[in-house]
Amino acid sequence: MARKEIIDEITMKRAITRITYEIIERNKELDKLVLIGIKTRGVYLAKRIQERLQQLEGLEIPFGELDTRPFRDDKQAQEDTTEIDIDITGKDVILVDDVLYTGRTIRAAIDGIVKLGRPARVQLAVLVDRGHRELPIRADYVGKNIPTGRDEEIIVQMSEHDGNDSILIKRED
């Protein structure tokens, strides 16, 4: 299995900054926003977007962590580790994840969100969209579109979890 770095730390930081600017441009009422990171790396990505929003707009955007395992149709959950202490009813929720692939994680995340309240709308921000959707899911904010083969895997590394920032592609030999 060969691994190759396709995005370095600087390019990754720029992609996150671009996503943040797009969120600002497309949302007139930033005070209605709630960021919800999908565990695990989506949480770190959402925190970085939250920090950039604070730097750029001076707003402290509410933040939560969503565990999609209890809502998956293909995986068994040990326990729900969701941490969302915010009333999302009437809010503009931005779900944040590292990679969008089949759409199944996002479907599970939406199921989790509607159990918590009735947001005004739900948007999706992803660092990488690699294609191959199995469900009609589309990201509103995309850092990088990286078309892949089904025999390839995108690996997002984030310093908070992996010790460095990069995006790798792993190919089966």
UniProtKB/Swiss-Prot annotation:
GO terms for molecular function: RNA binding; uracil phosphoribosyltransferase activity. One of its GO terms (biological process) is DNA-templated transcription termination. Substrate binds at T40, R41, D97, D98, V99, L100, Y101, T102, G103, R104, T105, R130. Keywords: RNA-binding, Transcription, Transcription regulation, Transcription termination. The keyword Transcription regulation applies. A motif (PRPP-binding) lies at residues 93-105. Belongs to the purine/pyrimidine phosphoribosyltransferase family. PyrR subfamily. HAMAP family: PyrR. Regulates transcriptional attenuation of the pyrimidine nucleotide (pyr) operon in response to exogenous pyrimidines, probably by binding to specific sites on pyr mRNA. This probably disrupts an antiterminator hairpin in the RNA and favors formation of a downstream transcription terminator, leading to a reduced expression of downstream genes. This is Pyrimidine operon regulatory protein.
